């Protein structure tokens, strides 16, 4: 927005600051500006001086806002945010990697000599970092043609925070497989694969972490640290020495033996972890021991950097608060015997600033003296925030009149092209003339403009006669930005949950549930093969050859339930399977009957979209996700058909289901039909009512609400309106199902969370459903597999992508302590937010709420639990929703439904006792707005955790690191979804055979009834040849990857797929050995054999025999087959067995490669030996 900056640059105030910089003044103060006006001033300084700028704010939230502004204003400069959580205790907790990746990116860019604009909260400056030279020496440049010693590289990677794994799927991991090294730098979008020829780097390629395939070839790669803690051998030795002397000094200060014992045990444990080479977060507390002189972030910035302190008095207040919190935190750790007495955790911000040689510029809203500052130049700018118009255009028109009289230049900003056009038409409606312009064109004094651009807030600068108005002031709702691309996209795409781990339960289709013990290579009659080793009841074991891998599935049942192992060869599994089969057949019958009824019934076919519909949709202030757009398209297509719609729309709370439903409602109202939206609770009704009222405000649509919050008079008016057709859309609880509610012409029924209505209500819903279009919304994920099997029974649309929001929820797993809770709550309240405190024990929830009130006396604390009456619960929730209470202590009832964007901190008590899926859903309750949200999963101090709880906490830790926890959560939710869809009684059946087998059985039963069985049966060839065809341990070590590859071999259906798999294996694992080559040969044989319907390829003592199916044999021309065989001389024998052709190929005295060539040659040639069919003309 260069043209807005020009106004600032031409002012005397700006020139005064620039002169001060030229004259070498150490400190200057700029007062009077706030919000985005400050950002415009900063961007003008950046452009004018062309110097790097380091801007410090009081907290992270403010730093984000400033970063967003500067990114919009400075298109040609890189603006970086250095995000640090202000809570000192969270520093040493296990934390999510996204913010760390951003911090590392900033440090790497600074050490590589870039001169960006960096924005950081004061907490970032207090933080200790490795000295700059240590960081620089930790950068590794790897180039093609250079030599690398894999073991040395592995040691260095571990020193700088990387973790070794079997397969690289998340940032911060590396793996070494023979001459192939995969590394996922934290600051790269994709991981890299380095291939060695002996020790020389032969090639470097980036690859996709999902399918592990290469993307592009590189000539070099710079690998920076994966953590901010770098521990080389010399640092380790220094720290060990200091820990020993610190421990001796601390033990002297303690009186009680018990205390000494605890301290000694804890510190010894830390030393052990340090000597093992661990670099986890908990060792961060020893940072001052590792380095002679730790660095601050400012030490990394170029010498000519201009330092700006944004609202300097607030920064000093925050510094005091941080010092106080840190002192309390250290006191707590000292009491617990977890820290030494002389440890420093951070720098003093004031001291660092005082030591700076660089020029300082202070921003302050008011002109006043601030402690610790002595500015030599003070500039007071006349400026004010733009007032909010909240859609009241008559107020804006009055303001515009004032601007015109004073000869102001006015700029309206719209987020994108569509928004600027919308702005133009809105202003024209109120006779406000505005010219379209862009940020490069000069502005003429006294004119009104519309321009594409985004700022956090508008402002007015009276002396410069400039006013900037954003959509934030014009309309109530803020337009969401398209975020800057996150670096961690690939890590979030998580592999299918069906991957097998050793110790998992599995289901064999013929033998039942067993425990998977790994993959083993066995030698039988001199032939090597890989087998899955499955343990059954007692000491029974089953070895399943990998070619039968599709008969084994991972067992997925309800979370926390251990399945029973079956006895091999027993009849119990057959009995259980039979029972489930019968139940599945019944369900399939019901579903097919339902399907036939739906197809036969006649409804109303809505007309295609018209201009008004398109206009209504373009007024949506956010960016739709692809899933939203697809769902909208599917729903409209259904509505335009004559058959009544029955569609389920699935998506988590806050994923944008409501907007999809609103568009469907608008379409129905456009055709003169009425719409009813049925919701389970009064609060949800209220929320939907507010949303719909706001979305429909520019259209002549009459909206009714029927709930406990309406007076009798209001309710009667709505009921009357529904009967005579004056009410177009009604939102209501089960009150809508009462006998007195009659519609003139209902066209669309929208049901939110149908599973939360009781049986009697569901019956009434069925009656209304009969001939109207029905859209059901649910937040419980419905499994895709089940959806496939139910295709055509109930249509399903799924919204799986969350709305684009810049910051993922920062998740911490940490011991519970009062100081942490107080800090987290106070921090959230300080930024105007609210807190969920999850406490899952109804009996003493009141006591817990009182405890929190005592911890944070300023907070208004409320509590809610499931044993309250519906009315009590709704009253509490409503007052929380309206901001009358700050902290809600609640049981898991907050899992569902109500969306409160202002809640951005979640604290979970006893997280180890909760299901992963619950934790995942709870975590989804925060982080709905454009702020960083925090989730603290706490467990009780010094509690011995059960093995299950420990595993669960481990999984939560993994899922803070974007690991597999997400998959487990989705899996459990999926099962719940299945239960909801099919009825609760199915839960037991799903558990008894596992979810995947159940889905498969249901799918087959439905296809059988639809007559689709012929389509699903594929011709299978059985191949039994004596070849060492397997994946040796030396080629792929990891069992999971082996299984994955065997599955891929099994699914090869064409020669193209075989070739692709060959390329992929060479790409991922290097050149393959003979044993793997034989696997490819067998796969190729199978492709041709299937095409020519060869039933069996079997090797006996001296030949390989091919048996061709009866139908295929009948099509073969004997003469042509004889000629084909002659090409191979005496090695081929031909004969018939009944009506089936048999071909035998000699193996005696020939190498495997020779007879394989002949087998392949004969199989390929079969397509050319068919009888000619003479077409009749």
UniProtKB/Swiss-Prot annotation:
GO cellular component, as recorded: cytoplasm
Free-text disruption phenotype from the record: No visible phenotype. An mfd deletion suppresses the lethality of pcrA DNA helicase depletion and increases survival of the strain in the presence of H(2)O(2) but not methyl methanesulfonate, although the surviving cells are very small.
High-level lineage: Bacteria, Bacillati, Bacillota, Bacilli, Bacillales
Localization: Cytoplasm
GO BP annotations listed: regulation of DNA-templated transcription; transcription-coupled nucleotide-excision repair, DNA damage recognition
Domain Helicase C-terminal, chain residue ranges per copy: 820-974
Taxonomy, superkingdom: Bacteria
Domain Helicase ATP-binding residue range list: 638-799
Role: Couples transcription and DNA repair by recognizing RNA polymerase (RNAP) stalled at DNA lesions. Mediates ATP-dependent release of RNAP and its truncated transcript from the DNA, and recruitment of nucleotide excision repair machinery to the damaged site. Probably required to repair non-bulky DNA lesions.
Keywords: ATP-binding, Cytoplasm, DNA damage, DNA repair, DNA-binding, Helicase, Hydrolase, Nucleotide-binding
InterPro entries listed in its UniProt record: CarD-like/TRCF_RID, CarD-like/TRCF_RID_sf, DEAD/DEAH_box_helicase_dom, Helicase_ATP-bd, Helicase_C-like, Mfd, MFD_D3, P-loop_NTPase
Motif DEEQ box, residue range(s) on this chain: 752-755
Main localization, broad class: cytoplasm
Species for this entry: Bacillus subtilis (strain 168)
Name of the protein in question: Transcription-repair-coupling factor
EC numbers for this chain: 3.6.4.-
Binding site for ATP: 651-658
Molecular functions (GO terms): ATP binding; damaged DNA binding; DNA binding; DNA translocase activity; helicase activity; hydrolase activity; RNA polymerase core enzyme binding
Covalent S-S links between cysteines: none
Family: In the N-terminal section; belongs to the UvrB family. In the C-terminal section; belongs to the helicase family. RecG subfamily.
Pfam families, sorted: CarD_TRCF_RID, DEAD, Helicase_C, MFD_D3, TRCF, UvrB_inter
């Amino acid at each position: 927005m260069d043209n807005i900056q020009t106004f600032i640059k031409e002012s005397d105030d700006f020139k005064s600051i620039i002169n001060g910089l030229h004259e070498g003044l150490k400190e200057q103060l700029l007062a009077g500006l706030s919000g985005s006006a400050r950002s415009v001033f900063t961007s003008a300084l950046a452009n004018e001086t062309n110097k790097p700028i380091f801007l410090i704010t009081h907290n992270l939230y403010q730093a984000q806002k400033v970063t967003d502004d500067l990114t919009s204003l400075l298109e040609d400069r890189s603006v970086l945010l250095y995000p640090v959580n202000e809570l000192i205790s969270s520093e040493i907790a296990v934390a999510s990697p996204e913010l760390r990746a951003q911090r590392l990116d900033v440090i790497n860019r600074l050490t590589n000599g870039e001169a960006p604009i960096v924005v950081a909260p004061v907490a970032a400056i207090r933080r200790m970092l490795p000295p700059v030279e240590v960081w620089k020496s930790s950068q590794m440049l790897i180039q093609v043609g250079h030599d690398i010693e894999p073991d040395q590289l592995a040691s260095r990677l571990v020193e700088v925070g990387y973790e070794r794994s079997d397969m690289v799927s998340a940032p911060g991991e590396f793996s070494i497989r023979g001459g192939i090294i995969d590394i996922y730098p934290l600051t790269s979008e994709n991981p890299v694969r380095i291939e060695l020829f002996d020790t020389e780097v032969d090639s470097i390629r980036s690859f996709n972490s999902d399918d592990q395939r290469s993307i592009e070839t590189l000539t070099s790669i710079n690998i920076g640290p994966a953590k901010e803690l770098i521990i080389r051998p010399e640092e380790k030795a220094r720290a060990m020495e200091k820990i020993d002397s610190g421990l001796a000094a601390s033990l002297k200060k303690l009186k009680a033996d018990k205390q000494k014992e605890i301290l000694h045990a804890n510190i010894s444990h830390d030393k052990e972890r340090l000597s093992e080479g661990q670099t986890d977060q908990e060792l961060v507390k020893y940072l001052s021991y590792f380095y002679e002189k730790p660095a601050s972030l400012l030490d990394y910035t170029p010498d000519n950097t201009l330092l700006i302190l944004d609202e300097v008095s607030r920064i000093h207040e925050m510094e005091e608060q941080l010092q106080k919190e840190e002192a309390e935190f250290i006191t707590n750790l000292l009491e617990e015997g977890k820290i030494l007495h002389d440890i420093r955790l951070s720098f003093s911000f004031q001291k660092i600033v005082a030591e700076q040689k660089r020029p300082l510029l202070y921003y302050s809203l008011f002109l006043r003296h601030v402690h610790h500052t002595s500015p030599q130049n003070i500039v007071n700018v006349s400026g004010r925030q733009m007032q909010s118009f909240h859609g009241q255009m008559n107020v804006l028109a009055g303001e515009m009149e004032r601007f015109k009289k004073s000869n102001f230049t006015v700029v309206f900003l719209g987020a994108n092209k569509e928004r600027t056009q919308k702005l133009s038409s809105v202003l024209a409606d109120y006779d406000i003339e505005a010219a379209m312009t862009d940020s490069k064109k000069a502005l003429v004094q006294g004119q009104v403009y519309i321009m594409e651009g985004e700022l956090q807030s508008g402002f007015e600068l009276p002396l410069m006669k400039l006013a900037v108005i954003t959509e934030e002031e014009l309309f109530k709702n803020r337009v969401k930005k398209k975020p800057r691309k996150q670096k961690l996209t690939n890590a979030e795409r998580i592999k299918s949950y069906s991957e097998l781990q050793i110790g998992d339960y599995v289901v064999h289709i013929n033998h039942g549930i067993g425990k998977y013990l790994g993959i083993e290579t066995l030698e039988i009659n001199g032939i090597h093969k890989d087998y899955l080793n499955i343990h059954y009841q007692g000491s029974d074991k089953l070895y399943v050859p990998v070619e039968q891998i599709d008969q084994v599935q991972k067992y997925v049942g309800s979370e926390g339930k251990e399945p029973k192992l079956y006895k091999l060869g027993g009849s119990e599994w057959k009995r259980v399977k039979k029972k489930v089969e019968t139940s599945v057949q019944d369900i399939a019958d019901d579903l097919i009957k339902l399907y036939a009824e739906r197809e036969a019934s006649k409804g109303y076919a809505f007309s295609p979209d018209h201009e008004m519909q398109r206009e209504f949709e373009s007024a949506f202030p956010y960016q739709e996700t692809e899933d939203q757009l697809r769902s909208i398209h599917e729903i409209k297509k259904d509505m335009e058909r004559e058959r009544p719609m029955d569609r389920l729309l699935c998506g988590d709370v806050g994923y944008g289901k409501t907007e999809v439903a609103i568009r469907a409602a608008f379409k129905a109202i456009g055709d003169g039909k009425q719409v009813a939206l049925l919701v389970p609770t009064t609060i949800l009704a209220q929320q939907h009512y507010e949303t719909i009222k706001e979305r429909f405000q520019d259209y002549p649509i009459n909206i009714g609400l029927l709930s406990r919050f309406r007076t009798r008079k209001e309710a009667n008016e709505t009921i009357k309106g529904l009967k005579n057709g004056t009410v177009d859309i009604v939102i209501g609880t089960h009150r809508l199902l009462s006998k007195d509610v009659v519609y003139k012409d209902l066209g669309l029924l929208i049901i939110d969370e149908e599973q939360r209505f009781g049986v009697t209500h569901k019956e009434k819903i069925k009656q209304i459903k009969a001939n109207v279009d029905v859209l059901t919304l649910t937040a419980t994920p419905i499994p895709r597999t089940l959806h496939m099997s139910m295709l055509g029974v109930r249509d399903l649309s799924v919204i799986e992508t969350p709305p684009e929001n810049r910051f993922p929820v920062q998740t911490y797993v940490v011991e519970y302590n009062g100081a942490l809770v107080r800090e987290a709550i106070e921090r959230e309240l300080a930024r105007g937010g609210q807190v969920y405190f999850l406490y899952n024990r109804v009996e003493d929830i009141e006591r817990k709420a009182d405890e929190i009130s005592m911890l944070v006396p300023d907070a208004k604390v409320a509590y809610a639990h499931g044993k309250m009456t519906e009315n009590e619960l709704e009253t509490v929730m409503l007052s929380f929703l309206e901001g009358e209470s700050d902290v809600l202590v609640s049981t898991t009832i907050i899992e569902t439904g109500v969306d409160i964007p202002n809640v951005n901190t979640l604290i979970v008590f006893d997280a180890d006792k909760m299901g992963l899926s619950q934790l995942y859903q709870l975590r989804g309750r925060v982080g709905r707005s454009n702020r960083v949200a925090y989730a603290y999963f706490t467990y009780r101090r010094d509690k011995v955790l059960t093995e299950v709880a420990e595993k669960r906490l481990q999984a939560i830790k993994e899922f803070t690191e974007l690991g597999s926890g997400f998959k487990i959560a989705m899996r459990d939710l999926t099962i719940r979804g299945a239960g909801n869809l099919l009825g609760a009684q199915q839960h037991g059946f799903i558990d008894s055979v596992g979810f995947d087998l159940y889905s498969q059985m249901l799918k087959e039963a439905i296809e059988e009834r639809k007559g689709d069985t012929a389509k699903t049966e594929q011709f299978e060839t059985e191949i039994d040849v004596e070849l060492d065809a397997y994946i040796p341990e030396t080629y792929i070590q990891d069992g999971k990857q082996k299984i994955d590859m065997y599955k891929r071999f099994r699914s090869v259906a064409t020669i193209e797929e075989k070739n692709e798999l060959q390329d992929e294996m060479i790409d991922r694992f290097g050149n393959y050995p003979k044993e793997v080559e034989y696997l490819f040969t067998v796969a190729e044989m199978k492709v041709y054999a299937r095409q020519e319907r060869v039933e069996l390829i079997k090797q006996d003592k001296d030949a390989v025999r091919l048996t061709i199916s009866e139908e295929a044999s009948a099509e073969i021309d004997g003469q042509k087959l004889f000629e084909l065989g002659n090409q191979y001389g005496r090695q081929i024998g031909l004969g018939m067995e009944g009506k089936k052709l048999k071909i035998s190929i000699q193996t005696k005295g020939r190498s495997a490669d020779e007879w394989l060539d002949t087998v392949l040659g004969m199989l390929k040639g079969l397509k050319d030996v068919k009888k000619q069919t003479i077409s009749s003309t």
